[in-house]
Every structure is written in structure tokens, then in C-alpha cells.
């Protein structure tokens, strides 16, 4: 889909920030800090077929639905993107995204690489950010330090991380999370800079020249 054929109203579009990262990179921590500093962010709530984790709430963290319901919605073109990850389906509803952006509000997406590639077809002008570990050795160390996953799951996550990193070449921005504070400063700066882009200020020039 081209920018010209997008379903969004370019006269009043918020900033869309898409953040992807392999498991263990620190994405959740960085996103939480960004949302705390910028509470104006709308957050894209995904649907998933996986069971809720401890302290997760339906309608707040995810919409937890059955596989049958997910497939039915997918066939109805309900999702802007969807993916099958680690044995479960994940998908981002399209309608709320369009409403949020057309109202001029900023929105944050926390999705995987498969989903980001699909979302690009609908939102090519979003800012796509990929978070990287400093090394694969460090990523393995972080995954093991959690103490929650079996060895086979750790190995699967490392394999997935390798595949995801190899697909990161098309993203707009890479941020290496070696130091959490430095990585956050870079993420914050990327967000603020994206708001200055002409593609998110389509009426600025017209308003400046109006009446001249």
C-alpha cells in the first residue's frame, strides 16, 4: 500500500511508533518508561490466543480470545497485522488504530517482526524501531538470568532472536540496549524527532502561508 492510498486521514494524523525486539532485549522496560514519561500515548492492545500470565488483565494487556475466534476475525480482515509466535496467535485490531491516529493522538505498537512487516503495508509512514542486544552472548545471559524458562525454550528464543535480527535491515532506527538509560535516551530522542517529520505535520506549511 502506498502512502497515497492509505486509509488514514493525513490532515489529522498522530505519530505511530512501532517497537520490535527479540525476547530478552529489554523492550518491555523501555516501553514502560516511555509510556510513563509520555502518558499521552495511546497503546495498541493486541488480541492473543495464549493464556494470561500472572498480573495480566484482559482488555488492558491483551484481549485474550480462543483460537477459533481469532481465526474468524482474521478471515474478516479484522486485524491490521497478525502473526503466529511461539505456538500462539497475536493480532492488532485495525479500527481502533485508525480512530486514534485520525484524531491526532500518538500511538505505540509493541509487536514482533512478522507483525511489523504486515503493519508497514497499512502504516508505511510510522516510525519503525528495532531494539538490539549488544551481543548474542549477552542476550543468552539475560534469558538465563530470568530463571523461568526450560533449556529448550531458551534455545528456541535464541534461534528466533537470530532470525529476527537478520530481518531488522528495513527498520528506520536501530537502538542497542547495552545500558538501559542510554537506550532509553535514544528511544526518547527518536520519538521526539519523529514528531518533527513533515509526514506527521501535513498542514503546517499551509497554516504558515495562509493569508499571505
UniProtKB/Swiss-Prot annotation:
It is found in: Cytoplasm. One of its GO terms (cellular component) is cytosol. Keywords: ATP-binding, Cytoplasm, Kinase, Nucleotide-binding, Transferase. Its EC number is 2.7.4.8. It is an enzyme of class 2 (transferase). ATP binds at residues 21-28. GO terms for molecular function: ATP binding; guanylate kinase activity. Residues 14-192 form the Guanylate kinase-like domain. PROSITE patterns: GUANYLATE_KINASE_1, GUANYLATE_KINASE_2. Belongs to the guanylate kinase family. NCBIfam families: guanyl_kin (TIGR03263). PANTHER family: GUANYLATE KINASE (PTHR23117:SF13), GUANYLATE KINASE-RELATED (PTHR23117). Essential for recycling GMP and indirectly, cGMP. This is Guanylate kinase. It comes from Lawsonia intracellularis (strain PHE/MN1-00).
Amino acid at each position: 500500500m502506498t502512502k497515497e492510498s492509505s486509509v488514514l486521514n493525513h490532515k489529522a494524523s498522530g505519530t505511530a511508533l512501532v517497537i520490535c525486539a527479540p525476547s530478552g532485549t529489554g523492550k518491555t522496560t523501555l516501553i514502560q518508561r516511555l509510556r510513563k514519561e509520555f502518558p499521552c500515548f495511546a497503546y495498541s492492545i493486541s488480541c492473543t490466543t495464549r493464556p494470561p500470565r500472572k498480573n495480566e488483565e484482559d482488555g488492558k494487556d491483551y484481549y485474550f480470545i480462543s483460537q477459533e475466534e481469532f481465526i474468524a476475525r482474521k478471515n474478516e480482515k479484522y486485524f491490521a497485522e497478525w502473526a503466529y509466535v511461539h505456538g500462539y496467535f497475536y493480532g492488532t485490531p485495525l479500527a481502533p488504530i485508525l480512530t486514534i491516529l485520525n484524531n491526532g493522538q500518538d500511538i505505540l505498537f509493541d509487536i514482533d517482526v512478522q507483525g511489523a512487516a504486515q503493519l508497514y503495508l497499512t502504516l508505511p509512514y510510522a516510525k519503525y524501531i528495532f531494539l538490539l542486544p549488544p551481543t548474542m552472548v549477552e542476550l543468552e545471559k539475560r534469558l538465563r538470568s530470568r530463571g523461568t524458562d526450560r533449556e529448550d525454550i531458551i534455545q528456541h528464543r535464541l534461534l528466533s532472536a537470530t532470525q529476527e535480527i537478520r530481518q531488522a535491515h528495513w527498520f528506520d532506527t536501530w537502538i542497542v540496549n547495552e545500558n538501559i538509560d542510554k537506550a532509553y535516551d535514544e528511544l526518547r530522542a527518536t520519538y521526539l524527532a519523529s514528531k518533527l517529520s513533515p509526514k506527521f505535520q501535513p498542514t503546517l506549511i499551509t497554516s504558515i502561508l495562509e493569508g499571505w
